[in-house]
Amino acid sequence: MNQVFNFSSGPAMLPAEVLRKAEQELCNWHGLGTSVMEISHRSKEFLEVAQSSEQDLRELLAVPDNYKVLFCQGGARAQFAAVPMNLLGEATRADYIDGGYWAHSAIKEAQKYCDPQVINVTTEIDSMRAIKPMRDWELSSGGAYLHYCPNETIDGLAIDELPDFGDRVVVADFSSTILSHPLDVSRFGVIYAGAQKNIGPAGLTLVIVREDLLGRASKALPSILDYSVLAENDSMFNTPPTFAWYLSGLVFKWLKAQGGLAEMDKRNQAKASLLYRTIDESYFYRNTVASANRSRMNVPFQLADSKLDALFLQESFAAGLHALKGHRVVGGMRASLYNAVPLEGVQALVDFMLDFARRHG
């Protein structure tokens, strides 16, 4: 079978080594004669998976000891509700940075539980879309926390600055950039991320929460979303998505074997630079994001003639370059370059783009 490179924004490409290992032990995991999907989540064998996964993740991200690591369900959208209901306490307001589609989605959900103080940070630089630097964010006073999304997958907008807002509790949706580069977890009160981009398959949600923020939950909060309940039960308040957890654990071990997050950062910068350079040097393709805010994970681009979009997608798919269609909100194309996408795949995409431009430009 010809090599296929999956540029989907999620569920995304998984490391080939991880898939091969899962295939090898699918029906006879650790000599038990059963699949890991079939064993109890409270068995000694699966508890070892859970503990090993957490330890590997803590090592990869250098998670401080005063943070809890939770493996949850419901995706990032569940966290849009869980965050205000866990963190507001007696407060009624929180600051929400609006930088794109997913930040706006979090705001819309938060309106059910609090009065979000919306701070629009989008701007333009030389007709290119951009994000204002953090020093220009006009935060309110008295908000329970500040929420933002460091990477907008649809718009290809990234906020690479680390927050430095004193005692302000900072909450961030790292769904699309978690584990793609080193991160100072201590700058945040809560980090959450859906698994289906850089962690593992869909079904698992990662939450990293500072311990002093536990115990503030609304009495109306469902127990399954209560960080304190999940922490007290080691993320097993109910039956977790065990297979997704197991596969995520394999991804963590793969990341460590590759050299950790510093190596991932190096690879991801190389991949993104190659694709952006190809777009910028071409008369046929364009990207409308200012260089300072270009996402390394999600690269949207448009063809000079949108009438060629369908043909581009048809031919790229036939060439083994899958899931390049842009989000329905913005159209065009999008290549997601998560950790498991190799430089070889981006080079194949670039070669195809140049050939397509020569034939149709």
Swiss-Prot record:
Pyridoxal 5'-phosphate binds at A76, R77, W102, T153, D173, Q196, N238, T239. One of its GO terms (biological process) is L-serine biosynthetic process. The modification N6-(pyridoxal phosphate)lysine is found at K197. Its EC number is 2.6.1.52. Its cofactor is pyridoxal 5'-phosphate. It is found in: Cytoplasm. It catalyses: O-phospho-L-serine + 2-oxoglutarate = 3-phosphooxypyruvate + L-glutamate; 4-(phosphooxy)-L-threonine + 2-oxoglutarate = (R)-3-hydroxy-2-oxo-4-phosphooxybutanoate + L-glutamate. Homodimer. Catalyzes the reversible conversion of 3-phosphohydroxypyruvate to phosphoserine and of 3-hydroxy-2-oxo-4-phosphonooxybutanoate to phosphohydroxythreonine. This is Phosphoserine aminotransferase. It comes from Sodalis glossinidius (strain morsitans). The gene is serC.
